Amino acid sequence: MTTTAQVREAFMPLVARHSDLVLIGRFLIVRPVHHILRGVFVDRSSDKRSFEPHIVTYPLVPAQETVMLGWNPVWLYDQSVGMWDVTKPDTITAIRHHIEAIALPPLRAIKTFDDYIAHERAKSTTFYGHFDDRVFTNILVAAALGDFSKALQLRPQDERIERYFAKFAPDFFPALESGNREFIANTLHQWEAATVKAFKMEHIWKPTPFPLEI
């Protein structure tokens, strides 16, 4: 498996070339970070010489403790290159160019929740299904957008969601039902801050109002 030091050696040249990139551990993140985390997560592989980079996008809510690939990550692969071999300089150069050409343009285009939704809906549904079926995420996105009716309409679709909110945010759905925008906004901000702290991203996070507050 590749090491974090090898990831840093391979991808810091990208950070040097692009002022909106920062590397935190294995995560090459596009700045600014507001509500949506955008980047390339350079995962380990069963082969000690190989990187497995994925395009990753997901909201900072709910509160998360560890970096994850999120829903339906896009594996960056170039058939003409094959395995991203850390021991081959030409391969490392190729992966940098691949990220610049394939990953960065769509990631940079995601600036709002609507952009995020469009990005997720455009992904292949072969292995993970359609984004609109991701009930939990869509409840939170609808709440962030201020569409409380949609968030409440999605609520009955999954009993696991009821258990989650009963444990971590029992007042969330009652606040949606009463139209308490201040409570929902404060809850989302607290979750974002917790995720940012866990991911050690305080220095690149730009706290901003949610659409429901504007």
Please describe what each predicted stretch is.
Residues 3-22:
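Amphipathic alpha-helical segments
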Residues 25-30:
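Long, charged, glycine-rich C-terminal linkers/tails
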Residues 33-214:
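Intrinsically disordered, low-complexity regulatory regions enriched in serine/threonine/proline
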Residues 2-3, 177:
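Short, charged low-complexity linear motifs
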